[in-house]
Amino acid sequence: MITAQTFRLDGRLAFVTGSSAGIGLALARGLAQAGASLVLNGRDATKLRATAASLRAEGFEVHERAFDVTDAEAVKANVDSIERDIGAIDILINNAGIQRRAPLHEFSHQDWHDLMQTNLDSVFFVGQAVAQHMITRKKGRIINICSVQSELGRPGISPYMASKGALKMLTKGMAIDWGPLGLNVNGIGPGYFKTELNEKLVNDTTFSAWLTNRTPSRRWGEVEELAGAAVFLASDASTFVNGHILYVDGGVTAQL
């Protein structure tokens, strides 16, 4: 029987990468509101400490680990440290990501490398390190933050599209390999949300007018609106959901 308790995350530890601000912070706060304890992650230790302190002031149990998720050795060391010193990771959200905008024929090799490292390699590194622990317990939830660009394209962001399209298939591959071992691996595909990453687009009146007309819900998303999807995929309400990408996009992917 489904009740409100089915969606509760009390007693569970959630590790969220790229969670010092924006979508990652909104996801972390949503999990905490459902009862989870948190481990936040980011590269900027000062910013991360401030974010953790603000969440603690809201009454949540919060830890932080500042490290670069594109560094495989640092990932392994920190995941092992979390498991040893804080507790077993029940929920992983791979949220860290970056954007670079340029026509493909002008896109630098370094920007391509940086984007793929952050948006794709890090998910493999963190996902593998956490899954190795989850597999020993025969349970765990992994949620990868994909994008509507896992399905749809726009000019000037081809490498980003490639990274998010690959992430969609990596998510499915993780579910195929790790599902038989007790893990549930799914993705969330955000549409267009008001974030620091999209600040220029939000302030571009021409683009905003096009986007709101293109979106059946006729507006930009607010980051808090992603939290429900994360809580669902992290909770006992989704025990038979595996290898799925849940698009939270106001209907953008529903129409041409």
Show which residues each predicted segment covers.
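Active-site loop immediately N-terminal to the catalytic Tyr-X3-Lys motif
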Residues: H105, L152-S158, P180-L181, R218, ...
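Short C-terminal tail/terminal secondary-structure segment
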Residues: I2-T6, L152, V231, N242-L256
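Active-site helix of classical SDR
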Residues: G127, S163, T171
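Conserved glycine-rich cofactor-binding loop
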Residues: L13, S20-A21
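Substrate-binding pocket helix/loop in short-chain dehydrogenase/reductase
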Residues: P103-L104, D111-M116, I142, F207, ...
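Residue(s) in the substrate-gating loop at a strand-loop-helix junction
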Residues: S147
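Alpha-helical segment proximal to the catalytic Tyr-Lys
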Residues: Q132, I176-P180, T239
